A protein has these predicted regions:
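Non-catalytic interface/targeting segments
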Residues: 1-53, 110-122
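Short active-site-adjacent helix-start/loop capping segments
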Residues: 42-44, 75-78, 104
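Residue-level recognition of alpha-helix initiation/capping sites
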Residues: 50, 76-77, 99
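A short, acidic, amphipathic alpha-helical segment used as a generic capping/interface helix at domain edges
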Residues: 51-61
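Mid-chain, well-packed structural core segment of small domains
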Residues: 59-95
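C-terminal structural segments of small proteins and small subunits
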Residues: 88, 92-120
Length: 122
């Protein structure tokens, strides 16, 4: 079978993940980060319990269609007040564990959606 290069090859994809790391295009990251199709940004929030309303300002400024919040090894839902600014900006939010967020991010990038994955390891 003849394979062709994918035109989406220039987008950031999550190529691996595990306990305490995520690899984006093969580059390993060991701290919280925000992954978007065109950039990867460090995220100052180290753990779920550190989330505050201002934690989402960086991702909100990028104006994604949807934010995937990866909450570490298990799914944990933030208080609605913490994410109110996303709702007010009409940015969707999906909360899931880190592994599900990584998989979902890649699917949405393949669909050429404006997605941001805000990924926490703890």
């Amino acid at each position: 079978m003849k394979l062709h290069a994918d035109a989406r090859g220039s987008y950031n994809l999550i190529t691996a993940y595990g306990a305490g790391y995520v690899a984006v295009n093969g580059q390993r990251h060991n701290a919280s980060l925000i992954v978007m199709p065109d950039r990867v940004l460090p995220w100052s929030v180290a753990a779920f319990d550190e989330l505050a309303p201002e934690s989402f300002e960086l991702v909100k400024s990028e104006k994604p269609e949807i934010v995937l919040l990866g909450t570490g090894p298990k799914q944990r839902f933030p208080d609605p007040g913490l994410t109110a600014s996303l709702r007010e900006a009409r940015i969707g939010l999906e909360v899931m564990d880190l592994q599900a967020a990584c998989r979902t991010y890649n699917i949405l990038v393949a669909e050429e959606r404006r997605v941001a994955a805000a990924l926490l390891f703890a």
